[in-house]
Regions:
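...with weaker cross-activation on analogous glycine-rich loops/strands in unrelated enzymes
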Residues: 290-354, 360
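SH3/SH3-like beta-barrel superfamily modules
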Residues: 61-63, 67, 74, 126-158, ...
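Second-shell loop/turn segments in exported
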Residues: 63-67, 238-242, 262-270
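N-terminal targeting leaders
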Residues: 8-11, 21-128, 133, 159-165
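Aromatic- and glycine-rich peptidoglycan recognition patches
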Residues: 164-167, 171, 194-196, 235, ...
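Active-site nucleophilic cysteine motif
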Residues: 255, 267-286
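Beta-loop motif signature
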Residues: 108-131, 180-209, 263
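Boundary regions of SH3-family modules and the immediately adjacent low-complexity/disordered segments
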Residues: 75-99, 149-182, 192-197, 217-254, ...
Length: 397
């Protein structure tokens, strides 16, 4: 009798444990599903948002681990779990990291900082940021810093590319008077006789204005170095902003100043550009910050054409090229150029050059016409993906 009772008790324990494990497994699946949904909502593009969250299932229950730069996403996840009655310890690291000790801002300190996909020099060149660009610093790994640029792009930079700043320092930098370099490429010198170079400079570089005379600006770099730039090559930032002529013709004029500049994967400076880095640079030099990559730019502005009816296009429109969607594969945008009229577009392919969609033209681009996808209009469009520097100044402020 005693053996029978013990057997029944053992069976009951097994059933209880089984049920408990079943409930736990069910909760873990729900938890994983909710994490995925939150990620899709707040961080659908890993190039611009970080949300790497995992679940540990230990003796004391569920534990959320990982990192993100999206506090609102974590708040949303905790609210959903509470609503569903799932208890989980939150050990997610919300960036910026504590070990930065308040140095969570930085300013690009060289003409064009190379930003990598991973924290090493051999990693892919993800993008570039030009001198004077204010960035957010999220964490440090070895000697490298994970930063986020004004267009929200996430990438790694070595310490030589930035000047770290705390809140007080970045506030002082932002509030100081600035100049913007408007020539395609040049140099800053230690004196007005232009003998000793301090640094090279690319178009769109922004520096602190220290003083000026009839012919030169005296400027300061983010790290405090001082130099001189000819007034023929730069403008006071506020003067430049107020003088911007954000029109199709100004976009075309700017685009042609980069003719022959070499193609560089990840390039967004006048030293070298990839296709989307080129269109991004053209728009920035006319006062507009647009998304970084072609596959992001294609979602900005308003649709114009998707059937190769080039008569609908206006100067300044962006044309996108790539692989069309099929029953088994998604569309893939891989290239972008800007329409300049007369059946022509300008783009960075091997170098910055002009191509035509006209079969009779000597510069007819059969390859790109054959993979044409659609055209978007960004000029004068109201879109949260487009930042107008005359209204919202993410570079300076």
């Amino acid at each position: 009798m005693k053996r029978i009772l013990l057997t029944k008790a053992f069976v009951l324990i097994l059933i209880t444990l089984n049920n408990s494990c079943g409930v736990r497994m069910g909760q873990k699946k729900v938890l994983a599903s909710e994490i995925e949904q939150i990620k899709n909502t707040f961080a659908p593009d890993k190039r611009t948002a970080l949300f790497n969250i995992d679940v540990l299932d230990g003796p004391s229950g569920f534990t959320l681990i990982g990192e993100t730069n999206l506090p609102r996403a974590i708040d949303s996840l905790e609210a959903v779990l509470s609503e569903k009655g799932i208890v989980a310890t939150n050990e997610v690291n919300v960036l910026p990291a504590d070990n930065l000790e308040g140095m969570t801002k930085a300013v690009i300190n060289i003409s064009a900082a190379n930003l990598r996909s991973n924290p090493k020099h051999s990693a892919e060149l993800a993008t570039q940021a030009t001198l004077g660009t204010v960035v957010n610093v999220l964490k440090k790994e070895g000697d490298w810093y994970l930063i986020q640029t004004p267009d929200k792009y996430l990438a790694w930079v070595d310490p030589g590319g930035i000047q770290l700043m705390n809140n007080a320092e970045i506030t002082a930098w932002k509030s100081s008077e600035k100049i913007i370099y408007t020539n395609t490429y040049g140099h800053a010198f230690s004196s007005i006789d232009a003998v000793n170079r301090i640094s090279d400079i690319v178009a769109g570089s922004i520096l602190k204005l220290v003083g000026s005379d009839e012919s030169h600006f005296k400027i300061a770099f983010p790290d405090g170095r001082q130099a001189y730039i000819s007034k023929d090559e730069a403008q006071e930032y506020e003067t430049w902003l107020s003088s911007l002529d954000y029109t199709a013709n100004s976009l075309i004029e700017t685009s042609k100043t980069l003719m022959g500049v070499p193609y560089l994967w990840g390039g967004t400076s006048t030293k070298g550009v990839d296709c989307s880095g080129y269109t991004k640079t053209i728009y920035f030099l006319n006062g507009m910050v647009i998304p970084r990559d072609a596959s992001q730019q294609v979602h900005a502005g308003k649709p114009v054409d998707s059937i190769a009816d080039f008569s609908k296009l206006e100067k300044g429109d962006l044309l996108f090229f790539g692989r069309k969607a099929t029953d088994s594969t998604a569309e893939k945008v891989v290239h972008v150029g800007m329409w300049i009229g007369d059946k022509q577009f300008i783009h960075s392919s091997e170098m910055v050059r002009i191509s035509s969609v006209d079969e009779e033209s000597p510069n007819y681009d059969a390859f790109n016409v054959g993979r044409y996808l659609r055209t978007q209009r960004l000029l004068n469009e109201d879109d949260p993906l487009l930042q107008n520097l005359t209204i919202n100044q993410p570079i300076k402020d």
